[in-house]
A protein has these predicted regions:
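N-terminal export/assembly segments and adjacent metallocofactor-ligating motifs
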Residues: 1-329, 334, 343-347, 355-358
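A glycine-rich, hydrophobic/aromatic-adjacent loop/helix-cap motif
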Residues: 340, 362, 366-369
Length: 369
């Protein structure tokens, strides 16, 4: 007979139904998993979503697959004729078929696919699927991704140089101002919502950009009701205001971004060391000293400047001597600022539906120092 403590228990763990991995307590009564509750003692266990709470239903659902099934009738037949097989047979059959395809058509003829780890229980398996794909010799990976995933993972790769992993936790605990742009963590990621709510109680300010006043937008200091599909106009306007009024960290831009690197006026590409001299390195980008006007090389491999970087210019046009003659260039930060100025504040407001007084007045009242 099983011990009563084994039949009734509260087991700490985490929810594996998405990449958030929220801390949980599994409730077992009479040997049956009956509930999944949040675990406040866990860093991400302040709350769990409806999908997590439905875990017992998934475990005991009558249609849950418990073992491999093999089709015994042709595709298109109303009755597939599923037949239970062993794991050994399933793995051997799959491996044999993959080897046949590789022998006949090459490994590149096979594509591997995986569900998004953000909304499924595959977050622990995705890296192994990719490892199998590369060991097999195929470059073809098809994955599903939510609309928000492209901005989070791919846009950050271009902005910061590295994609943000799905299970990342922003430093909401110490943030003075939080901006949620098209993001409702009450639905998408409860751990972010609870951390943001805690930050608001501490005194942090919240700005929400969303057509709908949903979730934490109801508690925001500033809600910008952008017209759907016009976010770019609002982003240009906000950037324009911040640059023109100096509401950004100048030192951070100089030190930690490519803002000082020179952009060629003739082709819009970054100026490189190979443009300056025949023996110059293509891995070297070029900035300009604000006080002397002399070029300062940046080594992208070493991740540092090769000269004095204390007063790099972030604005203005400079003429750089090249073997082909003088070439007009401007710092990347000024290049971006100029692009933002091409649309006036009034034009941007008319496009996105957010009043210019909100973009300027309310934003300035809530900017972070």
């Amino acid at each position: 007979m099983a011990d009563a403590n084994e039949l009734n228990a509260r087991i700490q763990g985490y929810c594996a139904l998405c990449v958030s991995r929220c801390g949980t307590v599994a409730v077992v009564e009479n040997g049956r998993f009956v509930a999944l509750e949040p675990d406040p003692s866990h860093p991400t266990g302040q709350a769990i979503c409806a999908k997590g709470r439905a875990a017992p239903e998934l475990v005991y659902h009558p249609d849950r697959l418990l073992y491999p099934l093999k089709r015994t009738r042709p595709k298109g037949d109303p009755d597939p004729g599923w037949q239970r097989i062993s794991w050994d047979e399933a793995l051997a059959t799959t491996a044999a078929r993959l080897q046949q395809l590789a022998a006949a058509h090459g490994p590149a003829s096979v594509a591997f696919s995986a569900a998004s780890p953000s909304t499924s229980a595959t977050s622990d398996a995705t890296v192994w699927i990719e490892r199998l794909m590369r060991a097999f010799g195929s470059p073809n990976l098809c994955v599903a991704m939510e609309l928000c995933g492209w901005g989070r993972f791919l846009a950050t790769r271009y902005t910061y140089g590295s994609g943000v992993p799905g299970n990342y936790m922003p430093d909401l605990e110490h943030a003075g101002c939080i901006l949620f742009w098209g993001y409702n963590p009450n639905i998408a990621r409860l751990v972010h919502a609870t951390a943001a709510a805690k930050a608001l109680r501490r005194g942090a300010r919240l700005i929400v950009v969303d057509p709908r006043r949903a979730g934490l937008a109801n508690k925001a200091d500033l809600w910008l009701q952008v017209r759907p599909g016009t976010d770019a106009a609002l982003a240009l306007a906000i950037t324009q205001v911040m640059v023109e009024r100096g509401w950004y960290d100048h030192e951070f831009v100089r030190t930690w971004t490519n803002g000082p690197l020179l952009v060629r006026s003739d082709n819009g590409r970054f100026l490189r060391g190979s443009d300056l001299t025949p023996n110059g390195g293509a891995q070297h980008y070029v900035a300009c000293s604000e006080s002397t006007g002399a070029p300062v090389l940046y080594d992208s491999g070493a991740g540092r400047y090769l000269g004095d970087d204390g007063d790099l210019a972030c604005f203005g046009t400079v003429e750089v001597a090249t073997p082909q003659g003088k070439l007009a260039c401007q710092p990347a930060f000024d290049f971006v600022a100029e692009a933002c100025r091409r649309i006036s504040l009034a034009e941007a407001a008319a496009i996105c539906g957010v009043g210019s007084e909100q973009i300027v007045g309310n934003w300035s009242a809530r900017r972070c120092a």
